[in-house]
Amino acid sequence: MGKKPVMLMILDGFGISKIDNGNAVKAAYKPNLDKYFKKYPHTELGASGLSVGLPEGQMGNSEVGHLNIGAGRIVYQALTRITKSINEGQFFKNEVLNSAVDNAVKNNSDLHLLGLVSPGGVHSHTNHLKGLLQLAKQKGASRVYIHAFTDGRDVPPSSAYMYIDDMEKYIQKIGIGKIATVSGRYYAMDRDKRWERVELAYNALVYGRGNKAASASEAVTNSYDNGKTDEFIVPTVIEEDNKPVTTIKNGDSVIFFNFRPDRARQLTRALNDNIFKGFKREKLDLKFVTMTEYDATLENVYVAFNNEVYKNTLGEYVSKMEKSQLRIAETEKYAHVTFFFNGGVEAPNRNEDRELIPSPKVATYDLKPEMSAREVTSTVLDRLDQDKYDMIILNFANPDMVGHTGIFQAAKKAIEVVDECLGRIVSKILEKNGTVFITADHGNSEQMVDYSTGNPMTAHTTNSVPFLYVSKNSTELRKDGILADISPTILQVMGLEKPKEMTGKSLIK
């Protein structure tokens, strides 16, 4: 007798909203999902704020969502931990942060603060940058420079001017710091090995090459004049007397204050790896600190806030129970179904196979809303035919990645393609008397319009997400669940007792 696979299908960025305006989820033609919502038990889950270990009212995101789902418990996020340490004062005693500042003071070298200057709270927070400036001032550092990456995805697309202005006012007030470069996150924070983008950011940081401006505010307005919003600001060097304010040089200290790893890794590698093949560059000798651990294999890097260890995540526990599992996603979300789902552990568990499907090489995903969903689907259907896996974790990236473009019609098409794909997968699993749980990690494409301004919205939302139980067995689901309740539910269906570390509760009544 063949296996009865249990699949968790994560529709990334697929939230629930009753409002029709800008709701690509509601507008999409999705006969399969509509049928499942009528036929099968379903509920809604909290996927933002306190429900996922973030500050109240803070939108969820993919890293946080997958961490909470995989851990089966509320995972208190780096944003919360770092903010708390600033408020309570431990931040200013952090040995690793202090060592970077001390290195600059002792050697009379520069202290460079790199990161996303945004209160979005997904990759970084401006309050953490302000905390670093306070620390530098306390320690007597005088040569402190900010390399500002502009957002436009987790906040409105043209809001950088406001955040840069706020930072320039703070610099004036505290009497320390200068903005040296401005780069859109499209360049500085690529995560898909598009090294030609990262190279432009690197050239601005290290060689002072790129667009030129007399101030950070001017860099932003120049970009707007050229029709480029915050995410796409071409790396720009701020000049004084026709010379760069500064560049990153041998002997300097660098603190990369992004706390989310996935979009900080590539630039960190370019600045630190002994052997680097992304593009031609000279290896610098730096005191380089990252706010959190971006990747255990990074060379020449010190970590200020180490990751917490989560014992008995879903993947680890299922492996201990001698069950086999498959993780599958396209490049954009591969780290989420592997590294983040496993509690920040890179190595696969025993009997955990992985399928990485390359994401399409397009400038922005509105140009190809289907992304690689059909390739993911055909691969997982082939794997199901092998009758090998007890559990499959699958992520469809489209609703999130296309939702981030702010282009409604593209997001609608993205959801329609995902609906077509998931219909094929669900049919196959039901044929095998298996179970499919359909959920999301956070909202996005259900709100493509900023209700207050009418402008396109590119950020995540605080909306709840669906949880569908698609199976030939009938059951009832409870209300008021959170993402941490998904793993205990999966274990119950697999006939496994949940480990004591999982504090989430099964959603089955």
UniProtKB/Swiss-Prot annotation:
One Gene Ontology cellular component annotation held by this UniProt entry: cytosol
Amino-acid positions noted as binding Mn(2+) 2 in the UniProt annotation, renumbered to this chain: D12, S62, D441, H442
Recorded catalytic activity of this chain's protein: (2R)-2-phosphoglycerate = (2R)-3-phosphoglycerate
Pathway terms, separated by semicolons: Carbohydrate degradation; glycolysis; pyruvate from D-glyceraldehyde 3-phosphate: step 3/5
List of residues binding substrate: H123, R153, D154, R185, R191, R260, P261, D262, R263, K333
UniProt-annotated binding residues for Mn(2+) 1: D400, H404, H460
Molecular-function annotations in GO: manganese ion binding; phosphoglycerate mutase activity
Catalytic residues as annotated in Swiss-Prot or TrEMBL: S62
Coiled-coil spans in chain: none
Broad EC category: isomerase
UniProt keyword annotations, A-Z: Glycolysis, Isomerase, Manganese, Metal-binding
Gene Ontology biological process: glucose catabolic process; glycolytic process
Swiss-Prot/TrEMBL cofactor(s): Mn(2+)
Cofactor remark: Binds 2 manganese ions per subunit.
EC code: 5.4.2.12
Family stated for the protein in its record: Belongs to the BPG-independent phosphoglycerate mutase family.
Subunit comment: Monomer.
PANTHER family: 2,3-BISPHOSPHOGLYCERATE-INDEPENDENT PHOSPHOGLYCERATE MUTASE (PTHR31637:SF0)
Function as written in the Swiss-Prot or TrEMBL entry: Catalyzes the interconversion of 2-phosphoglycerate and 3-phosphoglycerate.
UniProt-listed HAMAP family: GpmI
NCBIfam families xrefs: pgm_bpd_ind (TIGR01307)
Protein name: 2,3-bisphosphoglycerate-independent phosphoglycerate mutase
